[in-house]
Amino acid sequence: MIGTPYTEGARRAMLLGCGELGKEVAIELQRLGVEVIGVDRYANAPAMQVAHRSHVINMLDAKALRAIIELEKPHLVIPEIEAIATQTLVEMEAEGVNIIPTARATKLTMDREGIRRLAAETLGLPTSPYFFCDTETEFNQAIREIGVPCVVKPVMSSSGKGQSVIRDIAQSNKAWQYAQEGGRAGGGRVIVEGFVPFDYEITLLTVSAVNGIHFCAPIGHRQEDGDYRESWQPQAMSDEVLAKSQAIASKVVEALGGYGLFGVELFVKGNEVYFSEVSPRPHDTGLVTLISQDLSEFALHVRAILGLPIPNIHQHGPSASAVILAEGTSSNIRYQGIGAALEAVNTQLRLFAKPDIDGRRRLGVALARDIDIDSAISKALDSASKVKVIF
């Protein structure tokens, strides 16, 4: 049952994290009449602008997080970022609070160690070789054992912060320092992974719903500086590789438990598929689904967490997204060229309405459909290039 917002019978959902992905989740919740409460560490975050009300707290502060949940008494608590006091969510779930998809899934995926050990050691899924390191001495030993090239990531980071590829042993010290600076906790444990010389990488959006497990068409993407720049759907792949990918995604999602959409990241080399990471929430590369599917990843997530069925997912054809990236410092961001960006048929824009910028920041995304993937990517890139960010 869903009541009307602001009434006694309202269904209340609290978003922990109010960025561009949370904004789309908030919009989909509102389409189904859910009362939305946004929570983030800064004011006027994108999802706050479309929520019924919002709060600014440090979500890594266990007492502050518990206090806001106890104040609002939401029926659903939906983590949309990793930087949250997850142990508090575990405790509150045991007290009866509904954490999406589960508090365990949120805690396991908050850091790379929990999910990697689940995938490789508990589920026995194929992954790259890896070591976890607390000190620079352990780090250097791990590099010697794995060899170069190898990939270094903070155990806790997001959006590519602190990640680097070591191609020469002489880069080790710099990579260690960069990883320490990029971790969400201000330094600490890192993972050293063997470099998989993959042919391509995909995000397989996997939905756990009341009527079973569902898959979106695979999404290909290009990364730069640890963050995505373009994504496209569908990524061409053989039936054999797709079946392997779906089997891996199913095992991970079922092990994590709960209802919702999960972004499962996989490497593909030949006919082999390797597990990389998983997010128990919509994925940034999945922004392409705003134009590529009848139900976007955000609509699917909301249906699933509300316990609603998903009869089918229709994919419209070759589609792409291209990031609108800017660099500078301003709290008065404006945009020009929007008309030019929307001149081509089957193009759309999403401007995230972020309140400020200090450095490099993703401010929007261009979306396009065309006759084939290359044409869709080209159209999305062209559209994105026409949007001029004014400070």
UniProtKB/Swiss-Prot annotation:
Domain of life according to the entry: Bacteria
Keyword Metal-binding: yes
Pfam family, one: ATP-grasp
Molecular functions per Gene Ontology: ATP binding; magnesium ion binding; phosphoribosylglycinamide formyltransferase 2 activity; phosphoribosylglycinamide formyltransferase activity
Ranges where the ATP-grasp domain occurs: 117-306
Protein EC: 6.3.1.21
Binding site for Mg(2+): 265, 277
Role this protein plays: Involved in the de novo purine biosynthesis. Catalyzes the transfer of formate to 5-phospho-ribosyl-glycinamide (GAR), producing 5-phospho-ribosyl-N-formylglycinamide (FGAR). Formate is provided by PurU via hydrolysis of 10-formyl-tetrahydrofolate.
Family to which the UniProt record says this protein belongs: Belongs to the PurK/PurT family.
Summary of subunit composition and partner proteins: Homodimer.
Protein name: Formate-dependent phosphoribosylglycinamide formyltransferase
Organism: Shewanella sp. (strain W3-18-1)
